[in-house]
Amino acid sequence: MNDHVIYTQSDVGLNQFFAKIYSLVGMGVGLSAFVSYLMLYPFRENLISILVNQPMIYYGAAIIELILVFVASGAARKNTPAALPIFLIYAALNGFTLSFIIVAYAQTTVFQAFLSSAAVFFAMSIIGVKTKRDMSGLRKAMFAALIGVVVASLINLFIGSGMMSYVISVISVLIFSGLIASDNQMIKRVYQATNGQVGDGWAVAMALSLYLDFINLFISLLRIFGRND
């Protein structure tokens, strides 16, 4: 009887921890979506002006964004109070840079990609939490494949192959789907291994990881669905 009570309390604690992480992910995605909306509609003329006349603003934002990822991750793993604000600043800036990608696609394509991303994210999250299979090996394989995708993407910048871009996008969907599942399993295992003694910084770190999984999944699906846009 006591064992059942302990299990129930642990299960409730794990659910609360997942809820905390997913609220942060939702906050980040929502903030990115809001900033993208502002750039795509109220400030659309500014967006077009930057694309045509001042592209260095976009590239500068992309570089700052890349730096912020490492800063936010480092702050989160050190459990510093600045981790959450940095994560939110990154999410807002990412919304800005995303708008320059989204503007090239039809509105229906964007909604289709977003809803599909949400469905895949939800399904893979459940798989990651429920599966008994150790996914740490898969996680390593996904990161190795991700490096290959980055290299292939850089090469394709010079080649400009539409087919290669499509293949890269399909592989990216598989990679980030796998990472969503493995990240969720890791959250569960770390929580259980530490008996729930995990800091808020670690929650931010995992929220950042899941946020990146979702955004990259969305971009990959957007490119697949928008091939004819």
UniProtKB/Swiss-Prot annotation:
Localization per record: Cell membrane
Signal peptide per UniProt: none
Predominant location category: membrane
Transmembrane segments: 21-41, 56-76, 83-103, 109-129, 141-161, 162-182, 202-222
UniProt keywords, alphabetically: Cell membrane, Membrane, Transmembrane, Transmembrane helix
Stored InterPro entries: Bax_inhibitor_1-related
Keyword Oxidoreductase part of the UniProt annotation: no
UniProt topology in membrane: Multi-pass membrane protein
Xref: Pfam families: Bax1-I
Family listed: Belongs to the BI1 family.
Protein name, as recorded: Uncharacterized membrane protein SpyM3_0260
Taxonomy of the source species: Bacteria, Bacillati, Bacillota, Bacilli, Lactobacillales
